[in-house]
Amino acid sequence: MLKVQTEKGKIYSFIRDKWLVCTPEEEVRQNLVCWLVNECGYPLENMMEEYKNQYSDGRGVRKTRADIVIFRTREEKEKNYNAYIVVECKAENVKIRKEDFYQGTEYAQNLRAQFLILHNSRETNFYAIDMDKIPNKDDAFTQIVGIPNYSDIYDEKKVEDIKNKTKIFTREEFTSLLLRCHNIIRNNDKLSPEAAFDEISKILFIKIDFERRFKGTQVFTLDQFVKQEADYERFTRPTMRKQGIDKSYMQVLFDNTKLAYENDHLFEENEMIKIRENSFKSILTLLEKYNLSDTSDDVKGIAFEQFLGRTFRGELGQFFTPRTVVDFMTEILDPQEGELICDPCCGSGGFLIKAFDYVKEKIESDIQAQKDRFKTQLMSKHPEEMTEDQQIELNAQIDRVFKQLNSELEHVHGEKGDYYSRLDNLSYRSIYGTDANPRMARTSKMNMIMHGDGHGGVHHHDGLININGIFENHFDVILTNPPFGANVGKDQTIDEDDLERDEKRIAYYTDLYGTPYKKQLDDLKRRAQGLTVNGEKKDKERLLLNLYETGKMSTLTEVLFIERCLRLLKPGGRMGIVLPEGVLNNSNLQKVREYFEGKAKLILICSIPQDVFIKAGATVKPSLVFMKKFTDEEEKQYRSVVRKARNTVDAKYAPEIKELNDAYERKEIKHKSVYNSKLKEIETKKQEEMKPLIKKGFDYPVPIAKVDKAGITTTGGECDNELKDVLLEFRMYNTENPLWHKSTPNWDYSMNDDLRIIRSDNTNTVFLEE
């Protein structure tokens, strides 16, 4: 078995049979060579390092060297036949992006290889290559889960199976495995679906924690657990028993995991593993083929989300919004980098995750555009026909620039002082959510961790009450699916328990958001103490309904959450909310609708079939409602229209009111109750006559759509999705008639003479990390 050999600053190359300078790049390459030989069985005699190669990039012929090239046989290598596998290595410890390994894709294309391996010190990606689709690299290179072992390279069926094992296959396989794990617990331990889900989550995070501790180099397997458990039972548990502490090794692992995720509040302090050890071992056996530390975020995240969707039915189904609806609503509102996004009823976190991924994709696209720009800039400084040394120098320059730009896509905050990457800003400063259900708040955080972070702003808290970074006039985008049909009790109060007590968190948000945050925090403290603004003691100040103007009109949660969302938005902010259709057409909610029409513009109403939420347990027909809170200017316009309408109606009814007053003074109307009743009748007529005048004076078109199929059936299966057509039409409409001001991030990148990349915005200039 090969093992990397280093000595006195040198590292041994098995392929070239000589000692080389031990650089980080060379160490990465030699580790991979050992893996190719030891794990995959490829003979050293079939491999070449620094394989000389030339290719054309449109500007001329480039001469360069491939890191590793593998041929099927030694004879094919010596006769310079097509390569079987091409490998490109880099030293950096970052997520692999195929676009950065442009040389590797060029080598593989030029050498007509069947497989490409992209490898760095963090991860390894494998690609199958379809030469018929070259030069379209997006279609020609398909990411797969591995390469054939050497013993299988002539077995066409096995090779074809490996080429078909794409990431999508792995995702589906992983989802299926999670469901099998879930069934093991339900059958062995007789737990409810929700309790079984909690136990699966514990095991997943035990596994993730273990594999992160070893930086992805070890997978948590049953054999490892059995060996470690035996050592624990022999050496540690007897001592602990003498101290009055007795825990299974399974519980010890979970306690370590709770400690690792302590700041994320995923688990209660005294929470225990509640399944039998044989269930734990059976699940480890099913999961041991996956290294969750190394498995990509989209595989883990989407598999976990699909698992959630199949698990949360019945009572908890209300917390899960189908993916087709989440995608549609997010894409309608088109959140941008730098915008603050919130879901005050976040459930399993679907909207927050989609918004996170949606904005992250925009950031990645912009960074790729910057890479292309700087690459072109560097290439323009070199001759079209380059020597091999010149090409190596250019490649090194491009790699250095790419590495700096990649730091914008990594989590670096906490490691680099006050420097925040663009991904940090998105993860830690842009995404917020709350849920009053403790299981769902925890699930939302887990879901976001599985998808690649962004969970720090999620809290277990009543979504109608401010907490930490979630306060009024603060957000650009709200996406939510509030609970339907429930009522806020007339005696429900704001209590001391609703206040944040963690001084570190309070200090963090005070530093981040300043006076607006502090002001709302103080106001909430005042209400929790039952004090008026003037300091008088009045218990009604504590009533939750008194926080909301609509609380006088309705106690329905869906109504209160519409007002809550509008209050959370900045002027001009936009929201998408799932509502029962009754909110739009029930006569007893007319006043509620009029209230909202005086606070925001409707930008789209889309009626969807009841089928979409039947699997989640809903029994009412839903609509997707999109609104934009008035800008300051629109609010002035609306108030002006209301004032003119009132003046018009007042003038019309002034004679009638005068006549009524005169009659009362002449005592023709003897009872004040009769006078008040007639005055109220006139006021009601005035209010009714004002409505059409206001609508006419503040008129604007409202796009309305109705779909019969929204991508999901009553059983949760797939069907046609007409929401995609609505989205296309809305985008065209919004382009021709802009419905809101579209903010764009103001990042500017430049490169100095030392190849340092500088990021500038309106307030700061920083050097990107190397």
Regions found by a protein language model. Give the residues of each.
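Short amphipathic alpha-helical segments and their helix-coil junctions
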Residues: 6-17, 171-191, 282-288
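A conserved structural/catalytic subdomain of Rossmann-like adenosyl-cofactor enzymes
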Residues: 95, 148-152, 472, 477-770
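Conserved S-adenosyl-L-methionine
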Residues: 319-480, 484-502, 580-581, 592, ...
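Class I SAM-dependent transferase core
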Residues: 184-185, 299-324, 330-332
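Non-catalytic accessory regions of SAM-dependent methyltransferases
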Residues: 152-215
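Structural motif
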Residues: 22-27, 186-201, 274, 293-296, ...
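A short, conserved, highly charged catalytic patch centered on acidic carboxylates
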Residues: 1-115, 123-161
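Long recognition/docking surfaces used for binding and targeting
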Residues: 205, 212-309
